[in-house]
UniProtKB/Swiss-Prot annotation:
Subcellular location: Mitochondrion matrix, Mitochondrion nucleoid
Gene Ontology MF terms in the entry: rRNA binding
Stated name of the protein: FAST kinase domain-containing protein 5, mitochondrial
Predominant location: mitochondrion
Recorded superkingdom: Eukaryota
GO cellular component: mitochondrial nucleoid; mitochondrion; ribonucleoprotein granule
Record bears the keyword Transit peptide: yes
Keyword check for Phosphoprotein: yes
Quaternary data: Found in a complex with GRSF1, DDX28, DHX30 and FASTKD2. Associates with the 12S mitochondrial rRNA (12S mt-rRNA).
PANTHER family: FAST KINASE DOMAIN-CONTAINING PROTEIN 5, MITOCHONDRIAL (PTHR21228:SF70), FAST LEU-RICH DOMAIN-CONTAINING (PTHR21228)
Amino acid sequence: MAATLKSLKLLRYQAFCSPSAFGAVRSVSYWNASSTQHGGQDPPGHISLCHSAKKVKNICSTFSSRRIPTTSSARPGLEFSKTSSSKASTLQLGSPRATGIDEENVEVFDSFENLRVFLQLRPEYRVHSYSASETSQLLSVSEGELILHKVRVNQNNLQAQVIVDYLCKLSSLPAEQHPVLLGSTSFALLCQLSVRKIKLFDTQDLINVLKAFVILGIPHSHSMLDVYETKCCHQVWEMSVDQLLLVADLWRYIGRKVPRFLNICCSYLNLRWKDLSLSQLVHLIYVIGENRQVSQDLMQKLESLILKYIDLINLEEVGTICLGFFKSKTNLSEFVMRKIGDLACADMQHLSSHSLVNIVKMFRFTHVDHINFMKQIGEIAPQRIPSLGVQGVMHLTLYCSALRFLDEGVMNAVAASLPPRVAQCRSKDVAKILWSFGTLNYKPPNAEEFYSSLINEIHRKMPEFNQYPEHLPTCLLGLAFLEYFPVELIDFALSPGFVRLAQERTKFDLIKELYTLDGTVVIECPDYRGNRLSTHLQREGSELLWYLAEKDMNSKPEFLETVFLLETMLGGPQYVKHHMILPHTRSSDLEVQLDVNLKPLPFNREATPAENVAKLKCEHVGVSLTDDLMNQLLKGKARGHFQGKTESEPGQQHMELENKAAVPLGGSLRNVADKSGAMEMAGLCPPACMQTPRMKLAIQFTNRNQYCYGSRDLLGLHNMKRRQLARLGYRVVELSYWEWLPLLKRTRLEKLAFLHEKVFTSAL
């Protein structure tokens, strides 16, 4: 494999290392301060040092008010300047917190040291990680000037080991001199010489030079580092696991992603994974997570190692493992997640808030409902939230909504803590928090203050929403679930300009979100006169959502049986229509229409062949409720109600409410029979005698994912749908999972009787 890599990279490697690439050494500064930054991105496909040198600006102007001559006669004393040092100290290029980063990495860099706390908890980590606390004997300014003088004088005769030694020594200069050193053309020359000699560096040389780069704050976007990554790629198979992890850690400290290097590391570790120690395992997962790069095959092997060491892992390491798997978008099995939940619950009071948030992220990602963990979150989170960073609060809130876990204490603490510090929120935080409250269909006691502060923050952050357009529809839908409709923002979100921006700038398809928003505002804001989604996009959204809903429902045998039983009870498929009454609400319904006599109408023309329409007569079809059939149905009255048990969430029996018995058939069915005489069901009338429906029923086949966890409270989207159906004159008939699913095991007559009760009692 190493040979293959070498052959693939050889041409590029030679281009970087060829001495002919440095013809512009003395005329142009080496540093590319204005180049495109690589933070969070893959390095460019090909970068020539010579080409880079020809187009870059001289970084000396950033750090020093004068140019430094590069001839061998230049006085060493001119290299360092107290005044230029004070000017240069305004920016530390090497600090991760000073580098340009995209939104998704803000949290990573802002909490850089928190992410590395686990490295301080075992001495074994020192062998394969870099610590900023490492110290060496300081080099005086005069000694540094002398080294740079030697570089200029002896540039054609410097050996590889001497170059490495010079770089390491210069990194020992006082910190305030580092920016001045970076502005020195002599130091740029030294770095160029290091690239020229890099083929002669061994693994330890590479490590020492990378450490020097970390200390000095070499810009992570510098093209020279691409040469070093290539060298690291060639060196992988000569490294030990400890050296491999240390090199990866140094790249992390520099702030540059090195995908080629990590790909080869994964191949290397796929062969040696069984020999990883606990500290190596945790550190490797950290490195994989921070680089968002993963081999699924390797991650499965690492999961088995987690189980091997599970009893030895401390809580900070648990948080690191969860974060690594979360960032690499890799699942942990339910079994492992329950083990992790048990560890966290055993000592949650001593679990740091940082690790708590990381564990919460992974539970959200895997959708594992660890009941004891959820309970303890409900107890401990309200105490932690006031001191938790805004992004941590967002992740905690999003965890609750993803698992449909409504704990009012947690949500109230979030709502109380946010208004005073809402300015600290990113657009992403505002969006996810509003979405979470809306999804759980929960208004906190301070709803007015809470929502006004967040809506105002949306207005203030409009430039950021333009940069990350996917967050604006999320905000507005979260608000719409709870009947908040900021018209100006909705008008902007549905404007052609923003829709076009959303399609161009985001990797997410926002048509579903915008279509849901568009359909909602039409029904709930009749006076709205703002922008609407184009007809083309409305049709596209409708077709997409119907395809998904139809595919989902038709894959459920219990739903198909329900449709068949309704058709049987009412008289045929023309009396029932499976469609999306409100396409923008993302779920389908079974529609039934009743006339003034509460008899079903054959309104579903799609289910009636055209050649048969003319033959339809007002003849009775369907099931006639004769005295014998009524007696059979009513026999169960003496035995009491059906005892169908609710299917509960996994392991949540003690959280579920008491199961209600199914609706009794006796009295109510008699009442229906009394009101409708013989109660012969469903007379089929031809179109000529079709009546305007007195009542339109939306029969909804629900499941537990439409309710808050362990309760019968609808989630925001489904509650909004029922609200809108009512506005349009529909009466919702709910076939709830806790009633209907147990009944599917009963006889056909019992199912028909239950459906009859549901349909016709709702009409009364």
